[in-house]
């Protein structure tokens, strides 16, 4: 995750802003600079290489002292920064909006995946600039539309029916901020269209998840799509979701947290997010993740979760 101010800076033209991507040498200069505390939140002028991000975002970049940041000296950083600028320059951003836009925290990996989709000549985003920009505006929170299959970050499709597409995420192969844990495995499920879904399609998805992915929990971060994650990573997701929700509430950037379909979501996660929306503390909410919750009556007659051991999926072992 990183703020948009880590990728580009605004230049005032007439009554709106044009966004310009940073170059790696300007960032490198900023990372070595001694800057007064009162100037930490201001864009840094490297004198030689142009404008650089505010020094307060130093930890967002990979250095010898911080291996958790972005690999800003890669060509992928340039591609992501340019793509963000293209999207922001396609709309009008006024002075009253600028601070909110630049402080917005976005998913670096999501944006790298959109670059990969853009460069794939078999992908619809390769052929449609309009759809590409729409996908980026959704990814950076500048559009209120949800991420559907056409505008999704992408990955490897492992399941699809008339209503849903399930993607295996490819973060292990990334250049900008790769997942370093080689045991990482995670999926995302997007809606093919943002419209009511038939029970038949939901039943098909639930059957697939229970049969092939019974070692995973189906959760949501509240943005209109599902995530399929290892049970061992659920607590970490809970911390991130709670922190983001509280931060958005505090800053006034309140967006409706979409709980999604209770028949699909893991019941403990549904309880956690419902409790969070009611304003409870993190400790109170997280206890619900580890409690035995009484199983709701099976909404799909004939669809059982009971399996013999030799029938259980080996995905995720």
Curated annotation (Swiss-Prot):
Chief localisation class: host cell
Active site, UniProt feature: 225
EC number: 3.6.4.-
InterPro entries, alphabetized: Rota_NS35_C (IPR048306), Rota_NS35_N (IPR048573), Rotavirus_NSP2 (IPR003668), Rotavirus_NSP2_C (IPR024076), Rotavirus_NSP2_N (IPR024068)
UniProt keyword annotations, A-Z: ATP-binding, Host cytoplasm, Hydrolase, Magnesium, Metal-binding, Nucleotide-binding, RNA-binding
Single Gene Ontology BP annotation: viral genome replication
Cofactor(s) the protein requires to work: Mg(2+)
Subcellular location: Host cytoplasm
GO MF terms held by the record: ATP binding; metal ion binding; nucleoside diphosphate kinase activity; ribonucleoside triphosphate phosphatase activity; RNA binding
Region described as RNA-binding: spans on this chain: 205-241
Signal peptide bounds: none
Pfam families documented for this protein: Rota_NS35_C (PF02509), Rota_NS35_N (PF21067)
Residues involved in ATP binding: 107-109, 188, 221-223, 227
One GO cellular component term: host cell cytoplasm
Subunit structure: Homooctamer. Interacts with VP1; this interaction is weak. Interacts with NSP5; this interaction leads to up-regulation of NSP5 phosphorylation and formation of viral factories. Interacts with host DCP1A, DCP1B, DDX6, EDC4 and EIF2S1/eIF2-alpha; these interactions are probably part of the sequestration of some host SGs and PBs proteins in viral factories.
Protein role: Participates in replication and packaging of the viral genome. Plays a crucial role, together with NSP5, in the formation of virus factories (viroplasms), which are large inclusions in the host cytoplasm where replication intermediates are assembled and viral RNA replication takes place. Displays ssRNA binding, NTPase, RNA triphosphatase (RTPase) and ATP-independent helix-unwinding activities. The unwinding activity may prepare and organize plus-strand RNAs for packaging and replication by removing interfering secondary structures.
Family, similarity comment: Belongs to the rotavirus NSP2 family.
Official protein name in the record: Non-structural protein 2
Top-level taxonomy: Viruses, Riboviria, Orthornavirae, Duplornaviricota, Resentoviricetes
